[in-house]
Amino acid sequence: MQPLCRLYGSGVAQCTCAVLGGVDAYYTPFVRLEKGEIRNKDRRDVSPEENTVPRLVPQVIASDPEELKVLTDFLASQGYREIDVNMGCPFPLIVRRGKGAGILSSPEKVEALLEMMKVFPEIRFSVKMRLGGQDAEEWKALVPLLNRSCVTQVTLHPRIGKQQYKGAVDREAFRAFYEACERPLVYNGDLLTVADIRGGTGSVSPAERGDAGTRAADESGAGAGFP
């Protein structure tokens, strides 16, 4: 569904909600700055007048705190109280700009974004990420930052950015991340069948943790979105 969302914008979510239903939350394509300004297309995609789904969560992508602040100020002015920050997009053009998975190799930059979130206590921030940008061990430096942050949910796609969507997802790495992460966790990646959803979290049961445990989400714009 992601290609359709990029082509047709918010109308895809409206149609899916009206015809199919059963989706807890819809996450938008990236809201981002272009030459210092929010794109008109992005403004339309998150316009309250254009959206009738019960729960729409804007997804933003940023490389520095000031960029995140501009995006958050705008979305808060539109009445949003949930924002998802993408640190997982693997596409080279995004990565080269230090956004998406391109930020994961720089823990200090990730920490700066997490600190900016604290400036907006009225907003519930979530984070979407991968195991790393270039190395599957990079997450180990990031989990302590997430545990100290105000994020309310982490979505993990267990590949590195360099892989994009090639190769197998690393379910054992997801398990290790789960054991280290103190935030509610969502699994994302290669969920094509019901069996994939049941087995996708590396045999982690939500019952193993007293909080929200783990959930599985697809890459369609419903559930966790697009890392």
Language model features by range: what are they?
Residues 1-227:
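Flavin-dependent oxidoreductase catalytic cores
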